[in-house]
């Protein structure tokens, strides 16, 4: 009775302080580790993420993996330092649990872990990456890897201090922006020269949202929300709002409440999601496309998701769009149940999925069938894992050279740093071409459907595809 998709390998880590799971689709797999807050159903969350990761990793050699852990005795979140300290300690425990049962490579030979009864074949490839809650933990993970003498060294967790910093590079958002630009080219709009309206999910301190909202100087961010605030700016001054978003991005731990209120256009403002209700000006009502003069925050969030804007840009955590025939329980994200909308209710022209699992697949299909332009999270935000894979492969390649004494660690690090721009270019090239391939496939004549049908049947017959899971015909 295990729900599909069934991973090829699963490691479950259990202790009085932490519980976690790591799912892999194959022997060579990669994906991030999430600090989950879903104590009751974190495996469901990780399973959904690994499903998206499997598709996302089509652009690289490793198949998808995903891990997640929950704290069992967490201090109150209000005590930030104690909460973070417990999170880091539990993260280390979780990683130790994974490495305790993972084979190592010593001088070219696979060495099974001590005190483990092993029934499987050699299986030493285990790499991890940052995800929600663990964005700054790569060095910690590589420290655990070093303690274990693990063969991958600092290639175990990509994106550390000696690696490609995704937020600094803005690589995930830049990859998603390739999808945005292509969608708008379909509409005859150049996002880099023409103003366009945006509704956003996230805030400027985040990697994917913060970097994304700085990728065009012509963004008119009219509404946005995160887990704390709702931001409304009905008629933003493009240049001044861009500069203010840049300031917030550079401000450590900023929130929408830090936005300079004097720069917000008439009828706008920043409102706490904890308010009982929010009064809406005529200007705010016009840009959101509603008539109600006052709404509770959750109803307002629902209205924002349905706003008649050019672009809905998701840089947040959660599933906000489903199909009309799906129930909230089927979606598996209780935190967003109260304001989730149907794909048929979206009024934006384009959806960009910088965040994972923002829509269910049926929700995407329903939105696309009514004329909306959307790819999937696996397409839009694949640049992050693509960049990590480049880093790990370069480190593995150079590891042997360093070990042989033909390259010092400092020389290796300098070489890695010097390749940053080139790696970024190669990754974005993948984003450009995979969206191009999808658009070409979409515009092919109907008579090629027979070939696509045969391809799907062949993929399914060779166990590379499950049409039911992917909601394919």
What are these regions (language model features)?
Residues 77-78, 87-88, 99-121, 134-473:
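Non-transmembrane, aqueous-exposed alpha-helical and coiled segments at domain scale
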Residues 1-129, 138-141, 154-161:
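Extended, well-ordered protein cores
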């Amino acid at each position: 009775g295990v729900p599909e998709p069934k991973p090829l390998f699963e490691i479950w880590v259990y202790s009085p302080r932490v519980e976690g799971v790591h799912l892999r689709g194959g022997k060579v797999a990669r994906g991030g580790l999430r600090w989950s807050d879903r104590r009751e159903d974190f495996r469901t969350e990780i399973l959904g993420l690994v499903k998206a990761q499997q598709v996302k990793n089509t652009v690289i050699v490793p198949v998808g993996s995903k891990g997640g852990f929950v704290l069992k005795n967490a201090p109150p979140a209000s005590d930030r330092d104690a909460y973070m300290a417990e999170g880091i300690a539990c993260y280390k425990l979780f990683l130790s649990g994974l490495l305790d049962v993972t084979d190592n490579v010593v001088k070219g030979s696979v060495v099974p872990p001590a005190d483990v009864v092993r029934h499987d074949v050699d299986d030493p490839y285990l790499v991890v990456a940052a995800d929600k809650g663990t964005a700054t933990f790569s060095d910690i993970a590589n420290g655990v890897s070093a303690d274990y003498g693990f063969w991958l060294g600092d290639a175990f967790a990509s994106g550390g201090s000696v690696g490609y910093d995704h937020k600094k590079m803005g690589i995930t958002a830049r990859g998603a922006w390739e999808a945005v630009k292509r969608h708008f080219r379909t509409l005859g709009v150049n996002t880099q020269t023409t103003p366009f309206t945006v509704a956003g999910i996230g805030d400027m301190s985040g990697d994917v949202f913060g970097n994304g909202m700085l990728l065009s100087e012509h963004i008119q961010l009219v509404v946005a929300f995160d887990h704390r605030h709702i931001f409304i700016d009905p008629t933003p001054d493009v240049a001044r709002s861009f500069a203010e978003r840049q300031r917030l991005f550079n401000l450590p731990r900023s929130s929408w409440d830090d936005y300079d209120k004097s720069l917000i256009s008439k009828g706008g403002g920043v409102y706490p999601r904890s308010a009982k209700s929010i009064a809406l000006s005529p200007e705010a009502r016009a840009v959101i496309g509603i008539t109600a003069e006052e709404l509770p925050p959750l109803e307002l969030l629902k209205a924002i998701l349905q706003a008649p804007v050019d672009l809905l840009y998701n840089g947040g955590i959660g599933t906000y769009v489903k199909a009309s025939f799906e129930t909230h329980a089927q979606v598996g994200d209780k935190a967003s149940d109260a304001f989730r909308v149907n794909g048929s209710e979206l009024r934006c022209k384009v959806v960009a999925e910088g965040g994972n699992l923002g829509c269910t697949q049926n929700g995407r299909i329903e939105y696309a069938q009514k004329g909306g332009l959307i790819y999937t999270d696996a397409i839009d935000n694949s640049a992050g894992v693509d960049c990590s894979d480049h880093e790990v492969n370069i480190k593995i390649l150079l590891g042997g050279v360093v070990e042989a004494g033909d390259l010092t660690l400092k020389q290796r690090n300098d070489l890695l740093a010097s390749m940053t721009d080139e790696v970024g270019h190669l990754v974005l090239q993948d984003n450009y071409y995979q969206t191009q391939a999808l658009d070409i496939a979409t515009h092919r004549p109907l008579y090629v459907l027979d070939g696509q049908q045969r391809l799907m049947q062949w993929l399914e017959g060779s166990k590379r595809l499950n049409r039911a899971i992917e909601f394919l015909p």
